[in-house]
Amino acid sequence: MRSLFKKFIAIMTLSTIFITSANAVYVYRYQQEKTQWCWAASAQMIGHTLGRQVTQTDIVTQVKGMDINDGANDTEMKNAVTYATLRNSVLRSSAWPFASATNELSTGEPFLIKLTWYKNGETNGAHAVVASGYNIASGTLTVVDPGYRCGTKAFDYNSMITNCKFQSGTGKWTATIYV
């Protein structure tokens, strides 16, 4: 009987450790509707998760003043998240520490990650994705990519901030937008 009790306690302890080491926010994935609209799709996903339904066209028109297939700078992405969520958003011009990212996701709020692509050491474009979960034990963040033929996938945090092969390109996390 004692042995059975010890096994039960061990299983419960491991279960508790596992449950507290991982978390996920359900983020409905919207594919970007135009080739340069990853930022609008990412803002749309965050807005949807936080209870607001807006279209990518609405977001682009609000931020750019017209329906145009154009990328966005950091301030425009921040404005897109603010519009999509009707909440003030904050732009951090760098990656978050892993602990900050997991804390934000623990509150049930996904956030936008700007990925900067590099080729031969030079900046070669950028892409917006949404962080939706984490696993402390494996040191990963789950990313929802609005790009064509992409989806939801976990990536090693240390690779994300240095040089990582994401679903839609190779680069690193260079900015964060959260509410």
What spans do the regions from the language model cover?
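Bacterial N-terminal signal peptides that target proteins for export
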Residues: 1-12
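Hydrophobic core
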Residues: 12-20
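Generic anion/oxyanion-binding catalytic loop in active/binding sites
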Residues: 13, 27, 90
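Active-site nucleophile-adjacent alpha helix/oxyanion-hole segment immediately C-terminal to the catalytic cysteine
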Residues: 23-67
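Conserved active-site-adjacent core of cysteine acyl-enzyme catalytic domains
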Residues: 47-49, 58-179
